[in-house]
């Protein structure tokens, strides 16, 4: 990785996640369940751990109870080796105020950097689905001599207003010439007019440069104190920002299908689509890569069970993920992800859907193109995802593409 260098990891996990409502009504965005048994933050932490980072803090703020609990119960490295993953809420060290942005979160936590005295700081978001070897990015950063290196991936021009967009220096393509946060008029890549180079929200900083940058930013009254909107453009203006091409990152166990996969799951539609990427026989993103595992809480649960019901009707699943503790009894599950301890009962059908923990789909109910949060009950004979107008009238969120979302603990009646 960085021979002789001390590396420190910071995960920015204080985001509110308004675009994922109602899934973020009672939890922080990084705590949203994903892929059956995971939380979104598990992907960032797994990548850091697999990259041999051993001192990591998670900066939390918004409705962080379930996130803090997940980190404390799940992520417990060996403390005897000075390894830790610690959840750090806003400490109000610089006054009686909460974090006012991602850069301010680092400023208010600067004591952590003073205590550990790292040479390099890896800063990542907590709400993307991907695999990445940060050791390779750190080596690229050290070789470049940049103060900050930004991981980048190509994205369609139509999505540019969702990302920080990078323009490189033609004479020195490893350097960032311009960085614009969520532009409405992006500059496309010269060699690929339909694409832009987007920031992945992953950064490698020289530690002293990061500390100086967040302090400078704190003195700017017009700043939003945001990493992408303020800190990175400051480095670009100083000629100190480099870019790391994600397609140069080779993760052990990757295949041609899922190599360089990266998903921002900040909207309901992208969250739903990312689940669809998991479930085919040859998935676009492979959860089963043993060489670069995605870690999560080890559930003390029985195996999933797919059985006939009392009348002998078969329980069937097609192209689906079924988590521990779940039971499909005389029901049909297709192109769906079923969370732990969920039940799909006789004659019920769940198609093209994402079902969270402890949901109950009663006999002859139907769920299609829907996301059901924890503890949802779909009563016998009830349906979700059939009539978008009726779903909206019942108070459910329905996206323009027709994905219905049912909030935590809701009882859906016929």
UniProtKB/Swiss-Prot annotation:
Family annotation (InterPro entries): ADP-Glc_PPase (IPR011831), ADP_Glu_pyroP_CS (IPR005836), GlgC_bac (IPR023049), GlmU/GlgC-like_hexapep (IPR056818), NTP_transferase_dom (IPR005835), Nucleotide-diphossugar_trans (IPR029044), Trimer_LpxA-like_sf (IPR011004)
EC number: 2.7.7.27
Catalytic reaction(s) noted: alpha-D-glucose 1-phosphate + ATP + H(+) = ADP-alpha-D-glucose + diphosphate
Coiled-coil region: none
Highest taxon listed in the record's lineage: Bacteria
Enzyme class: transferase
GO MF entries: ATP binding; glucose-1-phosphate adenylyltransferase activity
Residues holding alpha-D-glucose 1-phosphate: 164, 181-182, 199
Keywords: ATP-binding, Carbohydrate metabolism, Glycogen biosynthesis, Glycogen metabolism, Nucleotide-binding, Nucleotidyltransferase, Transferase
GO BP, sorted A to Z: glycogen biosynthetic process
Pfam family, one: NTP_transferase
Involved pathway(s): Glycan biosynthesis; glycogen biosynthesis
Subunit organization: Homotetramer.
Record-stated family: Belongs to the bacterial/plant glucose-1-phosphate adenylyltransferase family.
Chain's role: Involved in the biosynthesis of ADP-glucose, a building block required for the elongation reactions to produce glycogen. Catalyzes the reaction between ATP and alpha-D-glucose 1-phosphate (G1P) to produce pyrophosphate and ADP-Glc.
HAMAP family, per database record: GlgC
Protein name as it appears in the record: Glucose-1-phosphate adenylyltransferase
